[in-house]
């Protein structure tokens, strides 16, 4: 949902994005709530209901695009998991990035979501670069549809890549 929102409007839900971006840095959780605060996932929960709970006739074009993207992301995450070399490298890089980000922003992992520490362009750049260096060259590209003005913007590209990485991690965690 947030990827499509950025691609179409250039905007995003700051709390929802910070929740999933923060989740990339939680590498030793004791529960699901340590990773994702359900309070900030309302938009995502609504999207699941819209994507899977309605008949095809009741779904809007945006819902169909988001559903297709989610299915492609699930397939991509599965491909990453099957490639042990890439999977291990990604895991190691996420661990290293988690340490770097939490050193720079001591409140990054706090239970109370600190949006200003998480949603920095530098963090989007770090996580987006990780996606670009490990996932992009080794797997099929995911096509993101939206407004060309927003898709050309480098900051938006980094946000989208960071969110794709967060989506891959979410799928892998869900399977575990």
Regions of interest found by a model, annotated:
Residues 14-26, 138-143, 148, 173:
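Beta-strand-enriched cores of mature, soluble protein domains
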Residues 67, 86-96, 134-145:
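A short mid-domain helix/strand-loop element embedded in enzyme catalytic domains
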Residues 14-24, 71-130:
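Long, acidic, intrinsically disordered low-complexity segments
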Residues 111-157:
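A mid-sequence, solvent-exposed acidic-amphipathic segment
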Residues 38, 59, 63-66, 120, ...:
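Amphipathic, non-membrane alpha-helical segments in soluble helical-bundle scaffolds
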Residues 1-56, 60-65:
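N-terminal domain-start signal
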Residues 159-176:
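Alpha-helical oligomerization segments
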Residues 50-90, 172:
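Aromatic- and glycine-enriched beta-alpha-beta binding-site module
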């Amino acid at each position: 949902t947030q990827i499509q929102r950025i691609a179409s409007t250039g905007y995003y839900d700051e709390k929802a994005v910070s929740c999933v971006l923060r989740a990339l840095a939680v590498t030793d959780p004791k529960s699901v709530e340590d990773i994702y605060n359900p309070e900030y996932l309302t938009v995502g929960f609504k999207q699941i209901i819209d994507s899977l709970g309605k008949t095809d006739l009741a779904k809007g074009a945006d819902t169909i695009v988001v559903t297709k993207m989610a299915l492609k992301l699930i397939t991509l995450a599965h491909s990453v998991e099957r490639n042990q070399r890439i999977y291990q490298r990604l895991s190691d890089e996420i661990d290293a990035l988690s340490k770097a980000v939490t050193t720079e922003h001591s409140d990054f992992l706090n239970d109370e979501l600190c949006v200003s520490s998480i949603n920095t362009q530098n963090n989007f750049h770090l996580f987006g670069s990780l996606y670009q260096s490990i996932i992009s060259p080794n797997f099929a590209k995911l096509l993101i549809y939206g407004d060309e003005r927003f898709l050309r913007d480098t900051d938006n590209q980094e946000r989208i890549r960071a969110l794709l990485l967060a989506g891959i991690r979410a799928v892998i965690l869900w399977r575990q």
